[in-house]
Amino acid sequence: MKRILLPLLLATVSLTSSAAGPLRIAILGDSYSTFEGYMSPAINELWYYPADSKRHNKANDVVSVEQTWWMQVTGRLGATLVQNNSYSGSTIAFQGYARQKEAANDGHSLRPGHPADYSPRSFIARAVNIGDSIGAPDLLLVFGGTNDSWAGTPVGDYQWGRWTRADLFTYRPALARLCRDLREMYPAMRVVFLINEGLRPEIVESTHVITKYYGYEYLNLSDIDKQGGHPSHKGMTSIADQVCKYLKGE
């Protein structure tokens, strides 16, 4: 496991908020961070469901929200979960998975076998909806890039501004745009990007370079047990262990 802590953020390592109350945490993620009844907005697509739900994937043993990595993290740190805006299948870039059939015009591609336009569910689109009536959280944990890697999203070029819509269908420009937006909208918020194991090397390297450029942190995760391609209860606990260890500076 590798990690980086940037000098710019050394003053924000404290696990209490600036108001001396509990640390306020938000999650921006994909299917790995979903659970029915805990997403905001509630219409987000999910992967994890309670054991008594007809939609629960019996191949995976995560059956309660208490088993999720993010609920374990907030519980162990005595933190407040401000919001979890995670969306199953979502990508950082606008490009999604290849179409299985012809679909309505989404402004990018119509033909089967061509990538779908995932811009409405993208991390960029959802980044504008972070926080609650009190304001932005103290800490945002961003857990994405997995679907970009699995969907074969092109990495594109390193680009730090003047992005066109076409640019945002590639990973590097999209991640840079996401980081820029977060920096402008929530300048005082600490942001840590969590990086799944087993991703394409160019996705991992790009995440390192771009998050560092914008003064954000990243944590490379490892040893995540999975069932059905998604963290099992054991895998969720492994993620929580690594995140808590990192946030505590251990």
Regions found by a protein language model. Give the residues of each.
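Hydrophobic h-region of N-terminal signal peptides that target proteins for export
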Residues: 5-18
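Active-site flanking residues adjacent to catalytic metal/cofactor-binding acidic residues
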Residues: 29-30, 130
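Conserved SGNH/GDSL esterase-like catalytic core that processes O-acyl groups on lipids
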Residues: 42-156
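Conserved beta-strand elements of the Class I
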Residues: 26-28, 140
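Short N-terminal helix/helix-N-cap motif within the alpha/beta-hydrolase-1
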Residues: 36-37, 151
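Alpha-helical cap/lid subdomain in secreted, periplasmic
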Residues: 21, 107-250
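Short active-site segment of divalent metal-dependent hydrolases/proteases
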Residues: 32-34, 235
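Active-site metal-binding loops of divalent metal-dependent hydrolases
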Residues: 30-31, 146
